[in-house]
């Protein structure tokens, strides 16, 4: 790409087009802030990642240094119901709207016990409700596993 202001302006307009209705709010400062975000967040009880985590033959997470950014961001295999990590941490993920898996815009949970009481009782939680088109956001309480939904009123 050329290093001219016109090229940068065109690129910013292309990025803004991903956010119809409020794309003009996206500026270079925000793009720079996004670039500084981590590709995943790992805590004692859970991992948050955009698309999922590649697993080895025993269902264990591959080591982070063996995973490409493309796998974390684009790989859709983790959404499959039969892909269950053999780990103690719950994985929060999205990338593929849940309506493409179960024909409804609801959080999909994969419990490891029959009566889950908190986030440690889940293998994985599929959070992507296709908010761009469904205008619905789903949240899950990490302490209880209770689900909450907010639907934007259609105009």
Where are these regions (language model features)?
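Short, surface-exposed amphipathic charged segments that create phosphate/polyanion-binding patches used
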Residues: 1-6, 141-143
């Amino acid at each position: 790409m050329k290093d001219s202001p016109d090229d940068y302006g065109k690129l910013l307009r292309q990025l803004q087009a991903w956010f119809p209705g409020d794309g003009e709010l996206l500026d270079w400062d925000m793009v720079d802030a996004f670039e500084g975000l981590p590709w995943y967040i790992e805590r004692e009880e859970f991992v948050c990642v955009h698309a999922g985590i590649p697993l080895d033959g025993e269902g264990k997470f591959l080591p982070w240094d063996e995973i490409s950014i493309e796998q974390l961001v684009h790989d859709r295999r983790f959404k499959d119901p039969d892909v269950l990590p053999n780990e103690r941490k719950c994985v929060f993920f999205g990338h593929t709207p849940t309506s493409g898996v179960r024909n409804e815009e609801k959080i999909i949970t994969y419990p490891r016990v029959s009566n889950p009481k908190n986030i440690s009782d889940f293998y994985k939680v599929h959070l992507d409700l296709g908010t761009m088109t469904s205008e619905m956001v789903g949240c899950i309480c990490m302490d209880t596993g209770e689900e909450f939904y907010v639907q934007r009123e259609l105009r």
